Amino acid sequence: MRLFVLTRHAHSTLNREGRVNGDPGVSGPLTPEGKGQAEHLGVQLSALPVDLCVYTRFGRTLETAELALAGQTVPRVVEPLLDDVDVGELEGATLEEYRAWKHEHRRDEPFPGGESLDDAALRYAKAFRKLLARPERTVLVVCHEIPVRYALNAAAGSDDLDGPEHAVSNATPYLFDDGALERAAERVEQITRSGRRAQPKRGE
């Protein structure tokens, strides 16, 4: 059996400030608390023979991976398809501002200057399929809250990618076998595409 360990990066300065970040060029290093979380993740993974580590273009994911895998010679690969959602002009906004925008707009509407949540969801499904196509047996995937949340809810068969698993803790390992990750990819695609067909145009 193959194993994919999906985890959100450890606690970052942007988490501490309660601000959103979808631009990998913006710095958001781990806090002292986050560094401790990443090291504890390494302890949790110590019994697993990790063959590959996949992380995103955001520095906090690489920093988490390096601390979790300290002392190990595990190959590492950057996967931009798992990058956090590009929120465009909402870069640096508070979580309250971000949630207010989401509440007022449909999932297929892009953030001003960014991408839509639907586009991000399909990107994540593509990333899951890309992971499934790899030959390694045990893969650590250090990414962000939204792709992990979508994978958890989709694999469980939920009709809502944002629930029932709403909160994804920092540096917590979530285990998926081939079947679970395949179900996640299929369900994310199904929900997103059916939602696009079902959503009425404004004024209807």
Feature-to-residue mapping (PLM):
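Active-site-proximal alpha-helix that buttresses catalytic centers in soluble enzyme cores
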Residues: 2-3, 7-72, 115
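Phosphate-handling substructures
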Residues: 14, 28-29, 70-126, 165, ...
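Glycine-rich phosphate-binding loop signature in dinucleotide/nucleotide-binding domains
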Residues: 46-49, 131-137
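Generic beta-sheet signal
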Residues: 4, 137-145
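Short beta-strand scaffold positions
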Residues: 55-56, 122, 142-143
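Acidic, low-complexity terminal tails and accessory targeting/binding regions
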Residues: 1-2, 44, 85-96, 153-204
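Short active-site segment of divalent metal-dependent hydrolases/proteases
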Residues: 12, 147-148
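Active-site signature of alpha/beta-hydrolase-fold catalytic machinery across serine-
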Residues: 67, 150-154
